[in-house]
């Protein structure tokens, strides 16, 4: 389960490192999919207090097993309100358009939310005053260079971090695609190369 680290590992690792996730920092991870599950594992290993956000009550136990200290169901207004103005950093991995304001209001003054999920259509425009009044930032990040990728691989080796995968045969690729579109994949599919026609 090391191959997906070159995408699903470095994509969350780079912004977590850049924005100094670590001891004494409260870090939110929005989404518990291919990128989000790695974000939780990495932020936990970096020593941050990790809060996972999901729209699904059924993912609470999975998020905790990945290393989340807390899990918030983002559809629950009371759970969201309990975290207003408390995050140093939020990594948003969701690749579907959604209300960014629901998460920027959770940032402390000078907090940053970094987007790594790329939706096919734009997010609704954020409320500017929500950013201005507390000097909050919305940023973006995409993978990393060779030295940072090597650093991430070394970090994962040191902490025993791998991507959670489902190994499939080459002849299952169409079925895997259909399942992925439906959201029926637990984190990452990996094709067993020994099943490729030679």
What are these regions (language model features)?
Residues 1-17, 30-38:
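A glycine-rich, Thr/Ser-enriched phosphate-binding loop motif common to dinucleotide/cofactor-binding enzymes
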Residues 16, 40, 60, 100-103, ...:
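Generic hydrophobic/aromatic pocket-lining and core-packing "Φ" positions
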Residues 23-32, 44-102:
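Adenosine-nucleotide cofactor-binding segment
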Residues 26, 111-112, 137:
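Short glycine-centered segments of the SAM/dcSAM-binding site in methyltransferase folds
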Residues 107-109:
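Helix-to-beta-strand junctions that scaffold the AdoMet/dcAdoMet cofactor pocket
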Residues 117-135, 146-154:
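Rossmann-fold NAD(P)-binding glycine/threonine-rich loop
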Residues 146-198:
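C-terminal hydrophobic helical "lid"/dimerization subdomain
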């Amino acid at each position: 389960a090391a191959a997906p680290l070159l995408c699903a590992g470095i994509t969350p690792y780079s912004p977590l490192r850049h924005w100094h996730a670590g001891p004494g920092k409260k870090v939110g991870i929005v989404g518990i999919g291919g990128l989000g599950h790695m974000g939780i594992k990495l932020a936990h290993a970096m020593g941050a207090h990790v809060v996972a956000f999901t729209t699904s009550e059924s993912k609470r136990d999975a998020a905790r097993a990945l290393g989340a200290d807390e899990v918030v169901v983002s559809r629950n207004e009371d759970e969201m309100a309990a975290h207003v103005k408390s995050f140093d950093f939020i990594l948003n991995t969701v690749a579907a358009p959604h209300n960014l304001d629901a998460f920027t209001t959770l940032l402390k003054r000078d907090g940053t939310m970094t987007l790594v999920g790329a939706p096919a259509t734009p997010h609704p425009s954020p409320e500017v005053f929500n950013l201005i009044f507390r000097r909050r930032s919305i940023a973006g990040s995409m993978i990393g260079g060779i030295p940072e990728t090597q650093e991430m691989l070394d970090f994962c080796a040191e902490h025993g971090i791998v991507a959670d995968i489902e190994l499939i045969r080459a002849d299952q690729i169409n079925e895997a695609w259909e399942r992925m579109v439906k959201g029926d994949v637990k984190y990452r599919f990996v094709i067993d190369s020994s099943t490729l026609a030679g």
